[in-house]
Amino acid sequence: MRDRLPDLTACRKNDDGDTVVVVEKDHFMDDFFHQVEEIRNSIDKITQYVEEVKKNHSIILSAPNPEGKIKEELEDLNKEIKKTANKIRAKLKAIEQSFDQDESGNRTSVDLRIRRTQHSVLSRKFVEAMAEYNEAQTLFRERSKGRIQRQLEITGRTTTDDELEEMLESGKPSIFTSDIISDSQITRQALNEIESRHKDIMKLETSIRELHEMFMDMAMFVETQGEMINNIERNVMNATDYVEHAKEETKKAIKYQSKARRKKWIIIAVSVVLVAIIALIIGLSVGK
């Protein structure tokens, strides 16, 4: 390893002629950990946004004609998640690209190892948050599709899953609704909900497509780095278990040592008594 002491220290003399050693603090890792904290906070924000998205999904699905305010709020949340996710991805990419420079530069292997580990952990945390978001979007799509199917049944039109998917992919709900006569209020309400749910799904699929590439890109990285993270976690757990085991063994050793010390003093005392008795017997024998 290269000696970094000359880089970190400098000498100067004060007015009295004494040598003063000035230690220059390495701000590189401080800046890195600050960036790590920013990324972690952004991921936590996405997790919070996803919970709000789920609540709005439930409200929209429970009402035949949900208020426009709720849908606007949902759309704003989706935009915020997308914007935050793109920022996180850009920061993680920048960190990843800096690894090559670090390897060819003057960074220590310890610093580089720390940076790689932090990057891997953040990437996996990010993918987990986006996977939860994707799961919420997929569930909302399926439940919205179920509502469309039920409303079509109300109008007297029975459809299969394949037929529903065909309608959604075409973007034209009129494929199934054009020949339905809205001769009653119930039928008109059903047709309105079919159209509304269809629009919701169209917006949803656009959002899913936009995030798919980013999600897959990060998921692939995490998959390749997953074994390294698992090894780190396994080593940490093993170290923790070893420390606990060492504590127990130390306690046993102390207890055993204490017992052994007591036995030693008992043996010494018994030996002294035996020597005294033998000396007494010899003394009496000689006296006779």
Swiss-Prot record:
GO biological process: acrosome reaction; animal organ morphogenesis; cellular response to oxidative stress; cornified envelope assembly; ectoderm development; exocytosis; intracellular protein transport; signal transduction
Membrane topology type: Single-pass type IV membrane protein
Broad class of where this protein is predominantly found: membrane
Pfam entry (one): SNARE
SUPFAM superfamilies listed in its UniProt record: t-snare proteins (SSF47661)
Membrane-traversing stretches: 265-288
Stretches of the chain forming a coiled coil according to its record: 35-101
Cell compartment(s), UniProt: Membrane
Membrane keyword on record: yes
Keyword Ubl conjugation: no
Keyword line: Coiled coil, Membrane, Transmembrane, Transmembrane helix
Entry GO terms, CC: basolateral plasma membrane; endomembrane system; extracellular space; intracellular membrane-bounded organelle; lamellipodium; plasma membrane; presynaptic active zone membrane; protein-containing complex
Functional note: Essential for epithelial morphogenesis. May mediate Ca(2+)-regulation of exocytosis acrosomal reaction in sperm.
Family indicated by similarity: Belongs to the syntaxin family.
UniProt-recorded name of the protein: Syntaxin-2
Species per Swiss-Prot/TrEMBL record: Homo sapiens
Taxonomy of the source species: Eukaryota, Metazoa, Chordata, Craniata, Vertebrata
Gene for this chain: STX2
